[in-house]
A protein has these predicted regions:
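Solvent-exposed, well-ordered amphipathic alpha-helical segments
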Residues: 11, 39, 43-44, 61-64
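Cys/His-rich Zn2+-binding "zinc-finger" mini-domains, especially FYVE domains
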Residues: 2-33
Length: 568
């Protein structure tokens, strides 16, 4: 990254206002904010007039900061009054909202020396993070040929995933590839060099397909395979979607960087959403909320003190027109990874710079992914169909792993239909006893935990929360500490009780009986409740664990299940 030296060091934060830009390594943290580093006292002093607004004069960094609804003595927008429609909801999810995980976890399943072919299906992939995490985590001992199928019903998401793979496979330099991928994926604005790459070798690959289908109907479907030695990418799209993919490599006519930033900020910093932002900020440590506010404002994924002046091109894969930003206001790259892993990642980022740590975390992850691609026999297949129709498109292939995100939630496809339509694509135990379909339930506990249930247990849950968070006497009717306690209660909820009720309500036993499948009582790929609190209140580190979960976007109520066919 522009703000990270090849050796993994942060550049001095003196970005050059009024003096030459410093390019030396930052060695000393600003002691007040611990968000930036300087090479020495001279640069720190020179930069102080600029930095003071992010530092001593930044109210979000003060331990005494309180949300606007409390200081203005009013009801927050998320409480009472008419039910608000979801803000800026365009049904677009370019970034994942659940932490990425290793779908293979070979060490606990087939073994790290596994030699047979491995077939993976991401039936509702969303962004490519789970695939990247999985391939980056494959042990060096495993040299199995792989086929990786990535499907999503949003053609824009499929297109971005294809571009990311092509960026990885057309660039030999791992550092350049990682830099390009991270900014295309997560930054609202990109560098001129990345834009030239998109409109150079990537455009050339896509344009060749578009020329071949010029005379075909708009709904005509065409597949194209690009081969890179032992690696390949096959993309199947309708003609209209191929043309949209080509268009996504170029800035929409008339879209300036200033206009793009205004469009984005009208969502990410919308005045009518201030209470929602402040509710999240109040749960975060000061450095995290300062970093979050800066990312909402600038939209470039870099360490806090890094210069952003080279990121002058609106990301054309996100800005698809001249008047809208595709994501909800709370979309955040951090939501796609384990918050505790980011915070604990060993790197050169300043102690309080959570987005700097994420930058280093992703640099390491994508570099390992790139390394795995270079040394492996991997064939990618990307599709854009409804998940329940996949059996019509994948042919005779069966899969060692299937990941379906949360389409198994009752509000989407549901577990019964998932098992009916997608389950048959899984290998049987005779082919691979470790073959599994991984389902996520994001909403199951909430669906059971209705208002009547809440009234029964709220007092008990609040008392449990207070074992981790010291209660403070309320300062008024809209005291933020009291209001956010309602969010914290999810972290102490008896989720097993409510999920058992959910399984009965959704007839899981009957699903197993009719399908010949079963869910594993002891998961071997991902924990059933991976984000749940592990420590009891009296244990060392419990309060810190509670605070980390509380400051993340997760509740601890997220449930994974691993399904397999019963052995005969």
């Amino acid at each position: 990254m522009a703000a990270i030296h090849q050796g993994g060091d942060v550049i001095c934060a003196n970005s050059g206002q009024g003096s030459p830009k410093c390019t030396r390594v930052g060695k000393f943290e600003c002691k007040y904010c611990r968000l930036v580093k300087y090479c020495g006292k001279h640069c720190q002093k020179t930069h102080w007039k600029t930095h003071i607004s992010d530092c001593r004069n930044n109210p979000l960094l003060k331990a005494t900061w309180r949300p606007a609804w409390e200081t203005e003595n009013r009801v927050p927008a998320f409480m009472g009054g008419p039910r608000l429609r979801v803000f800026n909801f365009k049904k677009k999810y370019p970034w994942g909202n659940m932490p990425a995980f290793d779908l293979l976890n070979l060490a606990s399943n087939e073994g790290i020396n596994y030699k047979r072919d491995l077939n993976l299906l991401y039936a509702a992939s969303g962004d490519i993070r789970n695939c990247v995490m999985t391939l980056a985590s494959v042990p060096n001992e495993c040299q199995s040929p792989m086929k990786v199928y990535l499907n999503d019903r949003d053609a824009d998401v499929v297109g971005r995933n294809a571009i990311i793979l092509l960026l990885a496979l057309t660039e030999d330099d791992a550092a350049i590839a990682a830099d390009n991928i991270i900014h295309l994926w997560y930054s609202a604005f990109i560098s001129q060099s990345l834009y030239e790459t998109l409109n150079g070798k990537i455009r050339e690959l896509v344009q060749g397909v578009c020329k071949k289908i010029e005379g075909k109907a708009s709904n005509a479907v065409l597949g194209k395979t690009w081969t890179f030695g032992s690696r390949s990418v096959r993309l199947v799209l309708a003609k209209k979607q191929w043309l949209e993919l080509l268009a996504s490599l170029e800035i929409p006519p008339g879209l300036t960087v200033e206009k793009a930033q205004d469009i984005r900020r009208s969502v990410t910093l919308a005045p009518e959403r201030v209470d929602y932002r402040h509710r999240r900020y109040f749960a975060q440590p000061p450095g995290d909320r300062a970093g979050a506010e800066k990312f909402r404002g600038h939209g470039v994924l870099l360490p806090f003190g890094a210069p952003r002046d080279s990121f002058t091109i609106p990301n054309p894969t996100l800005f698809r027109d001249t008047n809208s930003w595709p994501m909800k206001d709370d979309a955040d790259p951090i939501n796609g990874y384990r918050f505790d892993k980011i915070k604990g990642f060993s790197c050169d980022a300043p102690a309080n710079d959570i987005y700097g740590k994420l930058s280093f975390f992703l640099q390491d992850l994508v570099t390992r992914f790139h390394r795995r691609l270079k040394s492996s026999d991997i064939k990618f297949h990307l599709m854009n169909v409804n998940a329940e129709e996949l059996h019509d498109y994948v042919g005779e292939i069966l899969f060692d792993r299937i990941e379906i995100a949360n389409i198994s939630d009752a509000g989407y496809l549901g577990m019964a239909k998932t098992v009916c339509y997608i389950g048959p694509l899984l290998k049987r135990p005779s082919d691979n006893p470790c073959a599994a379909l991984v389902a996520l339930f994001l909403n199951a506990v909430d669906e059971i935990f209705d208002d009547a249930e809440k009234r029964k247990v709220i007092e008990h849950e609040i008392m449990e929360v207070w074992k981790y968070m010291r209660p403070q006497p309320p300062t008024g009717p809209y005291d933020a500490s009291i209001i956010v306690n309602d969010v914290a209660t999810q972290q102490v909820r008896d989720v097993e009780k409510y999920f058992d009720r959910y399984m009965k309500l959704q007839h899981f036993d009957e699903i197993c009986e009719m399908s010949g499948m079963e869910f594993k009582r002891q998961p071997t790929i991902i924990e059933a409740w991976p984000l749940r609190m592990k420590k009891k209140p009296h244990q060392k580190g419990a309060k810190e664990e509670f605070a980390t979960l509380f400051s993340s976007s997760n509740s601890g109520c997220e449930r994974y299940m691993e399904w397999r066919f019963r052995a005969n």
